[in-house]
C-alpha cells in the first residue's frame, strides 16, 4: 500500500524533525506463503534490498512471510484491492480464475524450466493469461522464477511405474497432484502438509511427492529411504505487483522495480537449481537410495487425464495444451 509521506515530510520539517528519520516516499508490502528459511524469502530479501538501493531509499519494501497476510488466494485479492503491493503465485494457481491455467501443472506437460518460460511468455495462451491478470485481476507480472520440480519419496524402491501400483501416496488436495497418483497406479491419499511426517513415520502412507527442498526442510528423508526422480510437475513462481501500486510509481521507479524483480527471479532460479543438485548428494549421504525410473510409461499413463482436462476446459484448455506440447523438446 502506498504511504504518502511528502506532506508528512513538509509538516515534520516545519516542526524541526530531521528528514533523516522519516519514512520512504513509498512504503510497500510483500506478502508470501513461504517462511523465512525458504529460497523464496531469500530472493524476496534481495528484491527488497535492490529496490531500496536503486531507488535511493525512495521505496521501502517490508516482507510478510509464512502466510501472515492470508493464503495466496487472499493475497491476490489484496493486490487487486490495492491493500497489498507484492506477492508470489505459481502460473497454475490462476486456475482459480481461469480453469485452463491448470495446464501449467498437468503432470509431464512442462518438461523443463525453459518450456515453462516459453509457455508463459511466447505462446498466445500465455500472453493472453498475462493480459487477463492485468485487466481482470489488477496485477502486473514482473518476472518468473523456477521453484523446483516434484519428486516421489517412498518406503520401497520405485524402479519402474509397476512399483507405483497400490502405493499409498500422500498428495495435496489439488486435482493435478491427485491425478498423478491415480493415473500412475498409486492410491492417492490427500492430507494436510503438517500431518505428512507422522503419517510417513507410522506407515499410514507409503510415500509423498514434493520438490527436493521441501523433502529436506520437512526432514522426510528421516522416515523415507527411497527417492524416485519422477520429475512429474515443475513449479514456477511469479513476482506480482498490484496495478494500483505500480501505476502510482513514476516511470523511473517502475523500471527500478521491474529490473529488481528480474534480477531476483534469476537469483531465485539459481537457488533452486543449485540446491537440487546439492540435495541429491545430501540425501545419498543420509542413506536414501535414489532411483531413476523410465519416465516414458509415466507420461503415457497421463493421456487419459489430458483428455479429461480438455473435456472439462473445452476449446481453451485444448488450445493451451496443444500450444505447450508444441514447444516441448
UniProtKB/Swiss-Prot annotation:
InterPro entries registered for this protein in UniProt: DctP_fam (IPR018389), TRAP_DctP (IPR004682), TRAP_DctP_sf (IPR038404)
TM region positions: none
Superkingdom, natural source: Bacteria
Signal peptide: 1-23
Binding site for N-acetyl-beta-neuraminate: 33, 72, 90, 150, 170, 210
Effect in UniProt of substituting residue 170 to A/K: Complete loss of incorporation of N-acetyl-beta-neuraminate into the LOS. Large defect in N-acetyl-beta-neuraminate uptake and binding
Gene3D superfamilies membership: Bacterial extracellular solute-binding protein, family 7
The keyword Iron-sulfur appears for this protein: no
Alphabetized UniProt keyword annotations: Periplasm, Signal, Sugar transport, Transport
Recorded GO CC terms: outer membrane-bounded periplasmic space
GO biological process: transmembrane transport
Keyword Signal on entry: yes
Location within or outside the cell: Periplasm
Subunit structure: The complex comprises the extracytoplasmic solute receptor protein SiaP, and the fused transmembrane protein SiaT.
Function: Part of the tripartite ATP-independent periplasmic (TRAP) transport system SiaPT involved in the uptake of sialic acid (N-acetyl-beta-neuraminate). This protein specifically binds sialic acid with high affinity. N-Acetylneuraminate (sialic acid) can then be incorporated into the lipooligosaccharides (LOS) as a terminal non-reducing sugar, protecting the bacterium from complement-mediated killing by normal human serum.
Additional information: Is essential for lipopolysaccharide (LPS) sialylation and serum resistance.
Protein name: Sialic acid-binding periplasmic protein SiaP
Species of the source: Haemophilus influenzae (strain ATCC 51907 / DSM 11121 / KW20 / Rd)
Lineage: Bacteria, Pseudomonadati, Pseudomonadota, Gammaproteobacteria, Pasteurellales
Gene that encodes it: siaP
Amino acid at each position: 500500500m502506498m504511504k504518502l509521506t511528502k506532506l508528512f515530510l513538509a509538516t515534520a520539517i516545519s516542526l524541526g524533525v530531521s528528514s533523516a528519520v522519516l519514512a520512504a516516499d513509498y512504503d510497500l508490502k510483500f506478502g508470501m506463503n513461504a517462511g523465512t528459511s525458504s529460497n523464496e524469502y531469500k530472493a524476496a530479501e534481495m528484491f527488497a534490498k535492490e529496490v531500496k538501493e536503486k531507488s535511493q531509499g525512495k521505496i521501502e519494501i517490508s516482507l510478510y512471510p509464512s502466510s501472515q497476510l492470508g493464503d495466496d488466494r487472499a493475497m491476490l485479492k489484496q493486490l487487486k484491492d490495492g491493500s497489498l503491493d507484492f506477492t508470489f503465485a505459481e502460473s497454475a494457481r490462476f486456475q482459480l480464475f481461469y480453469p485452463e491455467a491448470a495446464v501449467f501443472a498437468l503432470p509431464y506437460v512442462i518438461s523443463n524450466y525453459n518450456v515453462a518460460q516459453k509457455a508463459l511468455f511466447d505462446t498466445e495462451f500465455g500472453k493472453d493469461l498475462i493480459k487477463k491478470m492485468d485487466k481482470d485481476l489488477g496485477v502486473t507480472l514482473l518476472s518468473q522464477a523456477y521453484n523446483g520440480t516434484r519428486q516421489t519419496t517412498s518406503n520401497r524402491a520405485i524402479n519402474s511405474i509397476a512399483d507405483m501400483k497400490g502405493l499409498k501416496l500422500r498428495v495435496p488436495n489439488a486435482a493435478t497432484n491427485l491425478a498423478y497418483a491415480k493415473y500412475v497406479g498409486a492410491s492417492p491419499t490427500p492430507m494436510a502438509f503438517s500431518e505428512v511426517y507422522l503419517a510417513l513415520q507410522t506407515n499410514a502412507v507409503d510415500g509423498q511427492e514434493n520438490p527436493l527442498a521441501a523433502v529436506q526442510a520437512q526432514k522426510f528423508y528421516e522416515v523415507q529411504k527411497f527417492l524416485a526422480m519422477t520429475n512429474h510437475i515443475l513449479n514456477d513462481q511469479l513476482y506480482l505487483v498490484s496495478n494500483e501500486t505500480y501505476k502510482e510509481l513514476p516511470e523511473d521507479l517502475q523500471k527500478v522495480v521491474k529490473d529488481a524483480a528480474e534480477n531476483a527471479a534469476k537469483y531465485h532460479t539459481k537457488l533452486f537449481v543449485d540446491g537440487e543438485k546439492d540435495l541429491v548428494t545430501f540425501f545419498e549421504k543420509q542413506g536414501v537410495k535414489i532411483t531413476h525410473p523410465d519416465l516414458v510409461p509415466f507420461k503415457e499413463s497421463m493421456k487419459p487425464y489430458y483428455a479429461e482436462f480438455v473435456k472439462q476446459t473445452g476449446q481453451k484448455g485444448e488450445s493451451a495444451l496443444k500450444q505447450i506440447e508444441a514447444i516441448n523438446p
